[in-house]
C-alpha cells in the first residue's frame, strides 16, 4: 500500500505539472475530472494510478523522440509495472506496426508519450521532464 500511495502521489503531481506546461497540448490521467473514464476510475480504484500519457503541441513525432532521448531518470521501456519511472513512445514502439491512420484513430498520435511513474523523488522526476521537454 505504501508503494502504490507513492506512485499515485507522484503521478498526481506530474499530471498537474504537465497540464500547466505550455509545450504540452493534452494530458491523460484518470484523476482529472474531465478524463473520459474519471467516474469509472473513482468507483473502481482507491486512487488514480501511476499511468500518464501526454501529447506535445504540434503533434511532432521528432520532438517526442527528442523528449524521450533527453530523459535521465525515466527509462525507455515498454514494460509498465516496476518501482522505477518508465517512459515509452507508442508510435515508435508498441504501435509501430499499425498503419498511422488506424493508430491515430485510436488516439495513439505521433507525439503521444506514455509514463509509468515510479517512486523516486517527485521533484527530481518533474525536473527531468522539464529539462527534456524544454
Where is each model-derived feature located?
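PLP-dependent enzyme catalytic core of the Aspartate aminotransferase-like
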Residues: 3, 58, 85-134
